[in-house]
Regions:
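Conserved ABC ATPase "signature" region
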Residues: 4-24, 76
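Catalytic Walker B motif of ABC-type/P-loop ATPase nucleotide-binding domains
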Residues: 53-56
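Conserved beta-strand-loop-alpha-helix hinge in the C-terminal portion
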Residues: 107-137
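Helical segment within the ABC ATPase nucleotide-binding domain
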Residues: 67-81
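Hydrophobic anchor residue at the start of the ABC signature
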Residues: 42
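Conserved H-loop
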Residues: 82-88
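Conserved signature/switch motifs of ABC ATPase nucleotide-binding domains
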Residues: 27-30, 48
Length: 157
């Protein structure tokens, strides 16, 4: 009842290539960078061919440049594979850049506070004015206690 060996190998080859890990197939995890380990995890998940992929803070432990690269790769993979991705993050910028919808949860116990639609194509610029507006709205809703957002907060989009 498993996946035949030939199909398994074909899937692995395809997804290793898709996440740019060609040449690293026989390396141990300790021999890979944090970003490469994240890519390997994405390839492993895709090889299982799930309808929905749950990603809980997957890029939180990598540097900013790697994070941006992985975000772009995730968008490309999501489009190529036509997968639904449920992405958990505490990073507003990441949420509005990756999502077609952002769900703001309340503190424990978590309940849905608000849903924000992102009416843009998935291929979008990080500094798109509409993204900045939605991110500011989310930040305002999170900080509804009147706390101001620093002026340079949005500079790293």
């Amino acid at each position: 009842a498993g996946v035949p060996k030939e199909e398994r190998e074909e899937r692995l080859k395809r997804y290793i290539s898709m996440v740019s890990l060609n040449g690293f197939e026989n390396k141990y995890p300790a021999q890979l960078s944090g970003g490469m380990r994240q890519r390997a995890g994405i390839a492993r998940t895709l090889a299982m061919n799930p309808k929905v992929i749950l990603m809980d803070e997957p890029f939180s432990a990598v540097d900013h440049l790697t994070k941006c690269t992985l975000q772009e790769e995730l968008i490309n993979i999501r489009q190529a594979e036509n997968k639904t991705v449920l992405f958990v993050t505490h990073d507003i910028n990441e949420a509005v850049f990756l999502a077609d919808r952002v769900v703001l949860l309340s503190p424990r116990p978590s309940t849905i506070q608000k849903i924000y639609e992102i009416p843009l194509e998935q291929k979008r610029g990080r500094s798109d004015p509409l993204l900045l507006k939605i991110a500011a709205e989310i930040a305002k809703d999170i900080n509804s206690g009147g706390q101001d957002i620093p002026n340079n907060y949005w500079g790293n989009l």
